[in-house]
């Protein structure tokens, strides 16, 4: 047909080469070239960890293509001063005169199959950062996202460790009933103040706080960053606070059986489920975010949350002994 528009179903970055022939003769050729042009990249997630994992690759895209990037995140203030060459805009705001537009996220069809028009590879089989890198057509290298600087006076003699015990699903929690208490007791006995920086309070979704911790008062995320920067380490689960600690270059101990040991950042002290235990449901199946007690393999049985129940306090303390 003549005089018609056409659009490719693929929505991730492909450096297209388009050739149009007439009677076997090349009539028109166009090669993708974003240099000097305006490209819009949107973060599809409100989650702290997702934003911290992904924004670095928006900058890598800008540098690769030497283009003008307009990015939308739900926490622009965290990044705007560290990425002066990116124009940050509020999600939902109109952006005009664009050469290309991409959206970073985990996309599924109604039947829970992966939307391979938006994700070039099943995102469950990739690290959180490689998933973003793939959507933006980049060669993957782990990059630590830069976030706003804090003017914090660091006392090298201060013996403080931050912990974050809560997440957005019970499967993300460290479900060993004595795990946190044993680790807090060990730290207290070594003279460390243990600062709890999770915003949730005691008995949140039936989860008790360990004794011997100092609860950081709820407030701006910047104050949590300050406490982390003062600390010798952060101990957390597969949540945004672990990504925040890692982004701040604070030694990060990450306890998770919900995901496989390759799913988050590599430069951390990672404790996973012992060999032979059920693990990695997040990297095998689509998370049902509406089911707080989602445990697709063993829900309702004695093996529910086996992955993190089987992670012992001794396993965590062994990692802490490497640098505390």
Map each language-model feature to its residues:
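Catalytic machinery of carbohydrate-active enzymes
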Residues: 1-324
């Amino acid at each position: 047909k003549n005089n018609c528009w056409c659009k490719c179903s693929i929505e991730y970055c492909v450096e297209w080469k388009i050739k149009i022939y007439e009677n076997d003769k090349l009539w028109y050729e166009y090669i993708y070239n974003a240099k000097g042009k305006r490209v819009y990249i949107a973060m599809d997630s409100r989650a702290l960890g997702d934003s911290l994992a992904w924004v670095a690759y928006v900058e890598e895209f800008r540098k690769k293509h030497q283009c003008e990037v307009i990015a939308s995140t739900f926490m622009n203030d965290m990044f705007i001063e560290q990425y002066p060459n990116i124009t940050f805009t509020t999600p939902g705001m109109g952006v005009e005169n664009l050469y290309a537009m991409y959206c970073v996220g985990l996309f599924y069809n109604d039947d829970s199959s992966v939307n391979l028009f938006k994700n070039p590879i099943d995102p469950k089989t990739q690290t959180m950062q490689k998933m973003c890198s793939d959507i933006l057509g980049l060669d993957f290298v782990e990059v630590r996202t830069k976030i706003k600087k804090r003017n914090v006076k660091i006392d090298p003699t201060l013996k403080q460790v931050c912990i974050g015990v809560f997440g957005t699903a019970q499967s993300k929690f460290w479900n060993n009933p004595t795990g946190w208490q044993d680790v807090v007791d060990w730290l207290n006995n070594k003279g460390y103040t243990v600062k709890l920086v999770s915003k949730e309070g005691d008995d949140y979704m039936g989860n008790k706080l360990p004794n011997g911790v100092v609860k950081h008062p709820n407030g701006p995320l910047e104050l949590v960053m300050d406490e982390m920067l003062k600390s010798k380490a952060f101990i957390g689960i597969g949540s945004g606070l672990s990504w925040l600690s890692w982004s701040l270059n604070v030694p990060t101990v990450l306890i998770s059986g919900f995901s496989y040991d390759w799913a988050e950042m590599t430069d951390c002290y990672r404790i996973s489920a012992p060999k032979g235990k059920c693990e990695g449901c997040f990297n095998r199946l689509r998370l049902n975010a509406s089911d707080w007690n989602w445990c697709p393999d063993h829900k309702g049985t004695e093996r529910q949350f086996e992955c993190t129940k089987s992670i012992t306090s001794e396993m965590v303390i062994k990692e802490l002994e490497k640098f505390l």
